[in-house]
Amino acid sequence: MATHHTLWMGLALLGVLGDLQAAPEAQVSVQPNFQQDKFLGRWFSAGLASNSSWLREKKAALSMCKSVVAPATDGGLNLTSTFLRKNQCETRTMLLQPAGSLGSYSYRSPHWGSTYSVSVVETDYDQYALLYSQGSKGPGEDFRMATLYSRTQTPRAELKEKFTAFCKAQGFTEDTIVFLPQTDKCMTEQ
């Protein structure tokens, strides 16, 4: 009887370990010595990856958007994005509140009522930034998203390769990674 119980426990443990190995990393690193003042200014969303079904459903209709990062009064960041939706420019602002180390923020979604962590994983401040967001939309609905921001509308091929490698390391598959096409709409200063 003890041998039978041990066998089942061993199989259960192997199953748990197998799931742990297959799961994407829950923690991502943050840009060392993150300098928030250098991160401010205009960025373009050049790439996205997400485990959310909306990306697969809407990715053909998505296009690049312009985002402006400005300091918030609480030491966090205001991330204001302007994008094309139903042939009109729409603007949304997210307040990223400081959450621990520099480069780590939290965001409370008014739509979902959930709080997400947002990390600046890597940036050179002049050309690109890799951001990673994670949280939960509800019970059992984990949400993960990686974003490639570029200072220009035409990021270099090496940056796209870097973003793809980062996404795959986080468990995203090719069909969940999209590079957003350029658009002339909603990109001018307003």
Curated annotation (Swiss-Prot):
It is found in: Rough endoplasmic reticulum; Nucleus membrane; Golgi apparatus; Cytoplasm, Perinuclear region. N- and O-glycosylated. Both N-glycosylation recognition sites are almost quantitatively occupied by N-glycans of the biantennary complex type, with a considerable proportion of structures bearing a bisecting GlcNAc. N-glycan at Asn-78: dHex1Hex5HexNAc4. Agalacto structure as well as sialylated and nonsialylated oligosaccharides bearing alpha2-3- and/or alpha2-6-linked NeuNAc are present. Induction: By IL1B/interleukin-1 beta and thyroid hormone. Probably induced by dexamethasone, dihydrotestosterone (DHT), progesterone, retinoic acid and retinal. Repressed by the Notch-Hes signaling pathway. It is an enzyme of class 5 (isomerase). Glycans are attached at residues 29, 51, 78. Its main location: endoplasmic reticulum. It catalyses: prostaglandin H2 = prostaglandin D2. Belongs to the calycin superfamily. Lipocalin family. It has been proposed that the urinary and serum levels may provide a sensitive indicator of renal damage in diabetes mellitus and hypertension. Elevated levels in the coronary circulation may also be associated with angina. Changes in charge and molecular weight microheterogeneity, due to modification of the N-linked oligosaccharides, may be associated with neurodegenerative disease and multiple sclerosis. Detected in meningioma but not in other brain tumors and may be considered a specific cell marker for meningioma. Expression levels in amniotic fluid are altered in abnormal pregnancies. Catalyzes the conversion of PGH2 to PGD2, a prostaglandin involved in smooth muscle contraction/relaxation and a potent inhibitor of platelet aggregation. Involved in a variety of CNS functions, such as sedation, NREM sleep and PGE2-induced allodynia, and may have an anti-apoptotic role in oligodendrocytes. Binds small non-substrate lipophilic molecules, including biliverdin, bilirubin, retinal, retinoic acid and thyroid hormone, and may act as a scavenger for harmful hydrophobic molecules and as a secretory retinoid and thyroid hormone transporter. This is Prostaglandin-H2 D-isomerase. It comes from Homo sapiens. The gene is PTGDS.
